[in-house]
Amino acid sequence: MKSTVATVKNPTGKVQADICKPFSGKVFYLDLTSKLISEKLEKDIKELGGTVEGFLSKEISYLITSKKEAKCVKTLKYVCSVPSPEPAQNTGESSTSPGNRRLPQEGNSSKKNEKSLVSRGKSLVKKAIKEQEILPKNSILSNALNWGVKILHVEEAKRYIEKKKSSLQQVKKSQPVVKSESKHPARRKVKPQKLKSPYIKVEDCSCQYRPLYLVLPQFRSFQNTTSNYLVEVDKKADVGQKLAETKQSINKTGHVQDGANNANIKLKEQKKHGYCECCLKKYDSLESHILSPQHKNYSESAYYQVVDDLISTFEFDFVDWSKYKNGRKSVGILMLTEKYKAEGQERNEASKANTFSERVSATTPLQENTLKDPYATSCSVPPTPVCNTDPMFSLPSPVGSAELCNKKYTTDNFEQLVATSVPALCLKDNLPGSLGEREMSVVYNETKQNETIDHTMERPKIGWDASNIPSNILLYVPQKVDAVAQYANVSLKGNIHCSKLTACQAALTYGKMDPAVCDNITFPKTVNHLHNKEGHRTMDQIYPTVQSDELQSLLPDYSPSGNLHRKLKTSAQTNLADDELLCRLSHKVSVPQQNDVLNVPSETLLAMFESSEDKTEFFGFAGSCVCDPCSMDDGDNRDQAHKNLLLSLFSHTTTSGSSFLGF
C-alpha cells in the first residue's frame, strides 16, 4: 500500500500515463454482505481503471471483505511466519552435567530456561489451536492467505479509494485545460412541448435556426367578406340552409369561417369518386360517367339480355306510377308494351275463338241464367240466339282451351268449318285423338221438399284435341229446361219446326259431316209440352232420328250409333223457377264387355231401360257421332227407328279385346 502511494506522489515516466487510472491492471474481489456498499465500491474501482471479478482465484490482486478477522491479518501473518523450534540444537545439552549446574544463577536466566525447555510437540499444538480459533479451514480468508492475496477491510479500502480520488483531482487541476472550439454554438436545451391551436410557427428549412412560434388564445380571421366568384351569388337562400352552413363553418375554437370557404368544401364533398366494373374505369362523377358513350354502349349491348327478358316477365309493382301523370310513361315501359303487343293480340284472338266455339256447341233456346261460379264469370260471353230470339246460355271456356279451337271457326263459311273440324272422341284407347276412359257429361239434379225430378241427358260429343284437354273442365247447365232441350226442341205434335242448325253447331256437334246431310236435319222449337199429366214419358217421342242408310254412312267403324231411351220422373206441381243446377265432370270407369249382351233382343233392352227405377244417372256413350235427330211425322216409324238404332249400338262393337265404356 505504501509503495503504491509513493508511486503516485513521485511519478516516473512510465507511471505518468496511468495518473488518470491508478487501478489499471489490478483485479479486485468483493466479499461484502451489503449490496449497496458493494455497488458503490465497484463503481469507484471501475472509474479508477480497475476490474472486479466474481470468483476468487490466484489472479486476484486485492480481497476486500467486511469480516472482523481481516483486521488482524498482520498478526496472522506473523504467527504463520514464526519458525518451529528445532530439538536437534539442544541434543548435546540434554544431559545434565555438574558443569552446567555450576553456571552463575541470575533472576532472568531462570525465565529464559523455562521458555527454551518447551518441547517441539507442544509448540505445534499451540500453533494449530490458534489458527483454528482465528481462521477456519477452507474459508475465503485462509485461501487468500495461502495464495498470497492481499486482504483489505472495507474501511481501509474506502479510505484508500478516497485518497486516490483526491490525488487525481489535484493532478487534473495542475494540467492546463485545452478548450475545444465548436463550429456551431451550443443550443439552449428546451423541453419539447405540444403547441395548442391556434398558433403560428415559422420554421427554417435548413434547421440552422430554431423555429419561432406563437400560441394565440383566439385566431384572427384573414378571409374577406366578399365572394371569390366574379358572378354574384344569389342572396335569396332558405333560412334553414343558412343555419346549416353556419353550423358547419364553426370551428372547434368557436370562431366562424366565411361562406366562400364553405362553398369550396361543399364542392369537394359533392365529388364522389368511384370505379365502374362494367367499363373497368375510374370516374370522378357518377352522373357524367353514366352519360358517357362508353357506358351507354355497354348498357345497350346484349350482355344482360337474359336478365332483361326475365325482368320483363315480372309485374311492374315497384314503379312509382304517381310520377307518370296523364298517362305518360317512360321510354323503357313503352318499349316493353310494344314488344309484347303482338303476343297479347294473339292471346285475345285465341280466347275469343275458344269461347265462340264452345258457345256454339252449347247454345239452345234456353232462358238466361246467371253464373255463380267465380271462375266461370270471367270466361263467359254474351249469349247468341239460334233458331229463335230467345236468350242463349254461354258455356265458360275451360282452362287451357284456347289452343283447342281454330280461328277458322269464327267464319260463317260452312265449307271451311267442315274442312278444319277437330278430331272427334271415340271409344277405343289405342286410336289417336280419343279420350279413352274419360268421358264428359252433365248431370242435372233438382231437389224439392217432397218430390224429386231427375233429368239426365246425353251431351253432344264436341271435337276436342285429346292431348290438350284439361282434367278439371266444369260444365254448366241452365235452369228451367229439360236435359234433352240442350240439343233439340221438339213439339209433341211435330208440326212446328225451327230453322236448320247453323254451320258451326253442326260441325262441332256431329264432327265431320257432309253438308248435304245437314240440310235434312231439323229440330223442333219448344219443350213446353215435355211434362204430361201422367208423370212418366219415354224419350222415344222426343228424339227424331235420321234414316238408317244415312246414319251408317256417317258413323265410323269404332263409334256406336243410335239413341238411348230413358225415363224421366216429373211432377205436375214442380215450380221450374226455383230449380237449382249441379254441374260436374264425371269420369266413367270402363267395364269389360260381355258376350251375352250381343244376343239380347231389342225389346228386352228397351224394357230394361224403361222399367229401371234406380235413381242413378246414365251418362250415355262416348262417340264422335251420336244422336242425329231429324223431324219425323209418323209415330210408328219413329218407334221402329229407335229399335233399329239400339241394335246398331252393339252391332259395331266386337268381342275381341274392345271394352264397353258406356255405363
Curated annotation (Swiss-Prot):
Indicate the segments annotated as coiled coil, or none if absent. Answer: none
Zinc finger (DBF4-type) locations?
269-317
Species of provenance: Xenopus tropicalis (Western clawed frog)
Q: Where is this region: Disordered?
A: 84-119, 171-193
Tell me yes or no: is Cell division among this UniProt entry's keywords.
Answer: no
Name assigned to this protein: Protein DBF4 homolog A
Gene Ontology MF term list: nucleic acid binding; zinc ion binding
- List the biased-composition ranges (Polar residues): 87-99
Report domain BRCT positions.
Answer: 18-111, 136-161
Entry keyword Nucleus: yes
